[in-house]
């Protein structure tokens, strides 16, 4: 089904561009909004986003634009791919225009000042809008290169989920639905922290046993925290949980993994982020997650360890020693064992 009105993608980064291309390839007119007029002109002229997706041709049906008000007026369905630090400031001035719109967040981050997820910010800005999130093991370049990929659209609004499935589902991109918006979105935000740890481990030459341990203990930490916050633990066994965690912690294409790898090579955090040239949400998420875990009393040793390295002056060897000497806990402690007695 082709949408009668154009579809908006807000954000000129790598994943926003990949989603814009998918929509256009499925026969939809797309308005991709970005702040930078030079970036918009480069895409318009060269049909490529050289800064974020170099070498990927942009479909002719993707129109790069810089007028946000006009874009919101023209489009009913909007995919929001703005950095977590910018989402509120960009959209709040246009709150009235968002009423009744279908807003689907693509951003895997947490607002530092409030610990709100992106869909919660959208809900706060535009309470009359219909809100969803899209999350999963979706590396932007692989999506753009048509690697076989699956994702999850999550909302309690079934019609919104069906609309998103209809416009995005294609021969290489499969869209599943979930009603656990909070769990799907939280999983996407939390895993970025562990990708930094995984990148560091690889740069330091740690073995496959270590990488496997990190991923599985990361899943335990994520799920423990998510259950404390009210999410469904089963969500973390799906694409938006363990699926996203595996790809982000295993692939050099992952931005957060790249930051961790650079740190493992001896670069400072500032230099690692500068070398990346894009937003790595995991760095910001780490700060707020460490504070929140302490506040609510959730045991997250990997989060605490990475925070100690990046912000408290601890060395990696010191943190490893503390982690390995800590009292062993149960392996899977977020599922009730009452049925096994």
UniProtKB/Swiss-Prot annotation:
Taxonomic superkingdom: Bacteria
Main location per the UniProt record: cytoplasm
Keywords, ordered alphabetically: Cytoplasm, Lipid biosynthesis, Lipid metabolism, NAD, NADP, Nucleotide-binding, Oxidoreductase, Phospholipid biosynthesis, Phospholipid metabolism
Pathway as given in its UniProt record: Membrane lipid metabolism; glycerophospholipid metabolism
Binding site for NADPH: 14-15, 35, 108, 140, 255, 279, 281
Active site positions: 191
HAMAP family the UniProt entry points to: NAD_Glyc3P_dehydrog
The protein's name in its UniProt record: Glycerol-3-phosphate dehydrogenase [NAD(P)+]
Organism: Pseudomonas fluorescens (strain SBW25)
Gene name, Swiss-Prot/TrEMBL: gpsA
């Amino acid at each position: 089904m082709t949408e009668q009105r154009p579809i908006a993608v807000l954000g000129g980064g790598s994943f926003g561009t990949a989603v814009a291309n998918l929509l256009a390839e499925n026969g939809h007119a797309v308005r991709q909004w970005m702040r930078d007029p030079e970036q918009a002109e480069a895409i318009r002229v060269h049909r490529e986003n050289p800064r974020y997706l170099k070498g990927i041709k942009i479909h002719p049906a993707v129109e790069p634009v810089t007028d946000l008000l006009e874009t919101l007026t023209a489009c009913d369905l909007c995919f929001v791919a703005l950095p977590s630090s910018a989402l509120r400031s960009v959209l709040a001035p246009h709150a009235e225009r968002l009423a009744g719109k279908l807003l689907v967040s693509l951003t895997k981050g947490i607002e530092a000042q409030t610990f709100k997820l992106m869909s919660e910010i959208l809900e706060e800005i535009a309470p009359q809008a219909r809100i969803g999130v899209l999350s999963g093991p979706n590396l932007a370049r692989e999506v753009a290169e048509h690697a076989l990929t699956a994702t999850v659209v999550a909302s309690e609004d079934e019609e919104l989920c069906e609309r998103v499935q209809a416009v995005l589902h294609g021969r290489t991109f499969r869209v599943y639905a979930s009603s656990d918006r909070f769990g799907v979105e939280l999983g996407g935000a939390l895993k970025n922290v562990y990708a930094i740890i995984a990148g560091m481990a690889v740069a330091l030459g740690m073995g496959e046993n270590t990488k496997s341990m990190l991923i599985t203990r990361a899943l335990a930490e994520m799920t423990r925290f998510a259950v404390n916050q009210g999410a469904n633990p089963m969500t973390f066994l799906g694409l938006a949980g363990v699926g996203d965690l595996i790809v982000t912690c295993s692939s050099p294409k992952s931005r957060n993994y790249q930051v961790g790898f650079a740190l493992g090579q001896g670069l400072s955090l500032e230099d690692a982020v500068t070398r990346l040239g894009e937003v790595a949400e995991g760095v910001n998420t780490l700060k707020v997650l460490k504070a929140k875990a302490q506040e609510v009393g959730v045991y997250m040793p990997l989060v605490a360890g990475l925070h100690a390295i990046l912000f408290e002056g601890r060395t990696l060897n010191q943190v490893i020693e503390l982690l390995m000497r800590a009292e062993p806990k149960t392996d899977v402690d977020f599922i009730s064992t009452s049925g096994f007695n």
